[in-house]
Amino acid sequence: MWEARAEYADGSTVERYFSERPGIEEAEQQYLLECWLLDRHPDCTWYSVNYINE
């Protein structure tokens, strides 16, 4: 499972969990989630993407 979190300049935050997607390597999955966080809002001030062992 993946955890994606971000904070934005206007004070809004997002925290969401994602299941693993078969056939996608770990680095690619992390990159896709980072892009998702950055595309949600133009002024991202902080973000984190972590893999969580269940």
Feature annotation, model-predicted:
Residues 2-8:
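A short beta-strand micro-motif
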Residues 4, 13-14, 36:
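A general secondary-structure boundary signal
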Residues 7, 19, 50-52:
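A structural detector for beta-sheet-dominated domains
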Residues 8-10, 31:
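Short intrinsically disordered, low-complexity segments
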Residues 12-26:
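A short, exposed loop/beta-hairpin motif centered on an aromatic-Gly-Thr core
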Residues 26-27, 38:
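Intrinsic low-complexity/disordered segments
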Residues 27-33:
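Amphipathic alpha-helical segments in structured regions that serve as interaction surfaces
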Residues 34-54:
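Short, mixed-charge low-complexity intrinsically disordered segments
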